Amino acid sequence: MNVTSGSVLKLGNAGKFVRGLTYSASDVIEDTIGTAVMRSNNISNGDPVNFEELVWVNKIPNHEQILRDGDIVICMANGSSHLVGKASYYVDCGIESATVGAFCGIYRSDNPLTKWLFQSKHYKKHIQRCIQGGNGAIANIYPEDILAISFNIPSGYERVLNILNSLEDKYLLEQKLLCRYLAVKSHLLAQMFI
């Protein structure tokens, strides 16, 4: 979808939503050979997802559920309502099969602007209006809530987008190096304590 200054971008027209993987405690494995599952603790608002405390399961997600570089990972349900709606983006770290758990979702778009929209005040206000539950119940939002969000695109957005992307590229380079270091560390520890 082409975006122009002064237009309105609706997330449902710019991308799609993919539900997370449902699994049970019996599907969880100790090895890092299965599918890596990201949960709300792996989401930090506006930053790339973190790879700490991943859950590994012996279930195979469908093709659409496998995370791709640039996907937005969203907390869709949580006992703490302030965590619902928080979003990070996925940076491919070479994990063969990574997905999100059932209480999270994936927003996928080819439009580079959408990543930044999930960090906006407008997005956060919309999520606060949509949250269901809370007060002891699990608070949640629905895929339709995400896809219904519309953003007014200001004039000159291209210049700001270029600056944001340039800063982000530098940040991601450092993150990818860190991911590689962590992968080597994990491999060495696995070999050492067989």
What function would you assign to each model-found segment?
Residues 112-132:
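Glycine- and charge-enriched low-complexity intrinsically disordered segments
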Residues 166-170:
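Extracytoplasmic mature domains of secreted or surface-exposed proteins
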Residues 58, 105-108, 148-151:
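Short, well-ordered beta-strand elements within core beta-sheets of diverse protein domains
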Residues 95-102, 131-159:
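A short glycine-rich beta-alpha junction/loop motif
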Residues 12-27, 41-72, 94:
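Sequence-specific dsDNA recognition surfaces
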Residues 39, 63-119:
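A short beta-sheet element
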Residues 24-32, 130:
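Short coil/turn segments at secondary-structure boundaries
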Residues 1-22, 148, 153-159, 172-191:
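Non-catalytic DNA-recognition/assembly elements of restriction-modification systems
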